Regions:
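Acidic, glycine-rich A-domain
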Residues: 297-298, 304-451
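Secondary-structure junction/capping motif
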Residues: 2-4, 25, 127, 290-292, ...
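Short hydrophobic "helix-edge" motifs at membrane interfaces and signal-peptide entry regions
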Residues: 14, 250-251, 365
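An amphipathic, basic-hydrophobic helix/alpha-beta surface used to engage anionic
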Residues: 28, 37-325, 369-373, 387
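Extracellular/lumenal glycan-associated context and N-glycosylation machinery
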Residues: 1-56
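Structural motif marking the loop-to-transmembrane transition
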Residues: 3-7, 243, 381, 431-434
Length: 451
């Protein structure tokens, strides 16, 4: 539209100039001056329309979680000497979600105002600002309910403006792109029993360590390299020489979470569509997508959160688009790393869970527990668990009932056979509350709640 208008004015200018030269009449010259002046004025106006205009984006964090609200504050400043008639902000973010509770609109000469965001799905930063005076600024807050895990781009954003006649438009890049990672949601688990380590014959797993742990098992004389935190002061005072504490590796076993990310075992309804409600979303109404991939990742995230919060050492294995292996460790950094890995995990793997176990089984220490999360109903999974048991690793199955997700039947029968063999099994169906099932009780829940 802008180009066509400018071309129309240019054609009119050319015709009037040609008519004036051909006839010598002043009317044609006057019209030529008018159209020419309009073109020059509009061009100069458009060129200066974005002079001194700056857009800033301020995010509180580079990470969010499914169900939480991501907030981004935007500041549009006019540092130029001339007022701006209008400025359009165009954003190219890929963050899905739904707008939530923006502030009221308003702009005053003394204090910044708050512009109102559109009630549209997705992270909506794009807007049109009218009448931005010299030296003034406009602030507004974009709040988006995160509904999908993953790594998303925020920006880049560009500014557009033009002349009041709509003949010319100009644009410039305003902010570079940066990324936001949306972590999977975690559902609270009431109880999830993991056995202590064992040796052949049923003995507990005991091993001395040079590291300071919660298990002090005795004292010994000081050796070069021992830290001050190891000194047992009462024994030192009694024996009149430095005595240090000896520690033992925590008898709690390592727990390895193995997620089946094979593309061949995933199920989802054929008519699955984005069915989240539009508009303002209460936190409790963010639903888990009805796919085995999302339920499996939610189960893995919930287990990791539960076990790590109880000082367990947790590792993660998943063969998706790429191979993910996180060594077993404790603490908040390990939880963050596991959740970030699960956030970007895609079920495009080519190896089934039984093949992954055959490859990774030597990695598991003796006495560890392997939690296998899969929607694969094949009997080969039981053969893989036998391989783990031969290595003194305790397997536990978290089966996703593929039939309830629109896939092939067989998960319920596999769960029954595994239970008869003495394996601990949890069967998750579409609509179940994941935390309740992992705790030992299945309960249908229409809406997914975030811990």
């Amino acid at each position: 539209m802008t180009r066509s208008r400018a071309w129309v004015v240019l054609v009119l200018f050319s015709l009037c100039l040609f008519g004036g030269l051909a006839t010598g009449r002043e009317l044609f010259y006057s019209l030529a001056y008018l159209w020419g002046g309009l073109l020059i004025t509009s061009f100069v106006w458009a060129r200066s329309a974005l002079s001194g205009v700056i857009l800033e984006r301020q995010a509180r964090s580079t990470a969010a979680q499914v169900g939480s609200v991501f907030e981004e504050r935007l500041i549009l400043r006019n540092q130029g000497r001339l007022p701006k008639l209008w400025v359009e902000i165009r954003d190219h973010s890929t963050l899905p979600g739904y707008w939530a509770t923006p502030g009221p609109a308003g702009l005053t000469a003394d204090e910044p105002g708050t512009a109102r965001a559109a009630d549209l799905p997705g992270h909506r930063v794009s807007s049109v600002i009218a009448g931005l005076g010299s030296g003034r600024e406009l602030r507004w807050l974009v709040r988006t309910r995160c509904t999908r895990r993953g790594r998303f781009r925020l920006g880049p954003a560009s500014l557009e403006s033009g002349d009041p006649f709509g003949l010319f438009r100009i644009s410039k890049d305003a902010t570079p792109a940066h990324h936001l990672i949306v972590l999977p949601s975690t559902d609270p688990i009431a109880e999830f029993t993991v056995p202590s380590g064992y040796l052949p014959g049923g003995g507990a797993l005991h091993q001395r360590t040079n590291q300071v742990t919660a298990n002090a098992v005795g004292v010994r004389e000081y050796a070069p390299g021992d830290g001050l935190s190891r000194i047992h002061w009462r024994s030192t005072a009694r024996r009149e020489r430095l005595i240090v504490k000896e520690f033992e590796i925590d008898p709690k076993v390592d727990v390895w979470i193995v997620v089946d990310a094979s593309s061949m075992t995933q199920s989802r309804p054929p008519d699955l569509a984005e069915d989240q409600p539009r508009g303002i979303l209460p936190r409790s109404e963010v639903r888990l997508p009805p796919t085995t991939e999302e339920y499996g990742i939610a189960a893995a995230a919930s287990l990791a959160f539960h076990l790590l919060s109880r000082d367990r050492a947790v590792g993660l294995i998943a063969y998706g688009r790429v191979r993910h292996v996180l060594q077993a460790n404790r603490g908040q950094p390990q939880l963050n790393q596991i959740l970030e890995t699960l956030a970007t995990l895609e079920a495009f793997g080519r190896l089934g869970l039984d093949e992954v176990i055959r490859i990774e089984a030597p990695r598991f220490p003796r006495g560890a527990t392997a939690v296998l999360i899969t929607a694969d109903p094949r009997q080969s999974l039981l053969v893989a668990t036998q391989e783990l048991e031969r290595r003194r690793v305790s397997p536990m199955l978290v089966l996703l009932d593929a039939e309830s997700f629109g896939g092939v039947p067989g998960s319920a029968a596999l769960a029954e056979r595994a239970s008869r063999r003495g394996l601990r099994v949890r069967l998750i169906r579409c609509g179940d509350r994941v935390g309740n099932v992992l705790s030992g009780a299945a309960q249908p829940l229409p809406a997914w709640k975030v811990a």
